[in-house]
Amino acid sequence: GTDQVFASLEKAQFATPTIALIPNMKGYELARAAGAKTVTMVLYASDGMAQKNASMSMAQADEITLEILRLAKQDGIEVIATIAVAFACPFDGPTAASTVEKGVARFMKAGADQVVLADTIGAADPQQVRALTATLVEQHGAGRLGCHFHDTRAMGLANVYAAVESGIRRFDSSIAGLGGCPFAPGASGNVATDDIAM
C-alpha cells in the first residue's frame, strides 16, 4: 500500500520534508509506522464537504484531528491541519470567514505546527484571500499559516500574491499544476510550483 511506498522513499534525497496526507486514525498509524515525520490532516469548513469527502461531520473531523494531534505530539511528528473549502464549498456555497477563523484558532491553540487554508475548488478571489489572511495574520502571526490554492478560474497565482501581501510565506503547489478534487467537479489542479517559484 501507500505506507510501503512511503517507507521505501529515500527521504534524505528530497529538498523538502516528505509529508503524509492521512484521512483518519488508521492512516496516522500507517504513516507513523512508515517513518513519517510530518502528516497532514484535512478539516472542513462545511458539513457538505465533510460528508462527501470523509463521510463525517465537521465536528467529527475536528475531534479525530485533535486526537491525532495529541498522539503526534507524543510521537514527535509534526501535524499540518488543512482546512478544506476555506472560501467556498461546491455543496454548501460560500464559506463564512468566521467559520474559518474559529477553525484556525482551535487548531493553533491545540498546537498544530501549521494551519493551511485550502481553496479546494478554486473559487477564491484575491480580495477574499487578502481579507481573510490579513485577519488571521493579525490574530496568529504568519509563521504557522499557509495556503493551498487551486487554479480553476486562473486566479491561483493572484491569490498567492494576495496572501503574500498579508505576510503568508508557505504555499502548497504541484508540479505542472497537477491535482484536483474528486468531490469538486470541474476543479482543476493546484497552483503550479514553477509559477510560484518564478
Outline where the language-model segments fall.
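N-terminal capping/small domains of soluble enzymes
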Residues: 1-26
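Short gly/pro/ser/thr-enriched loop/turn and capping motifs at secondary-structure boundaries
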Residues: 46-49, 177-182
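Core AdoMet radical
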Residues: 16-23, 51-59
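Conserved hydrophobic beta-strand within the GNAT/NAT acetyltransferase core sheet
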Residues: 20, 147-149
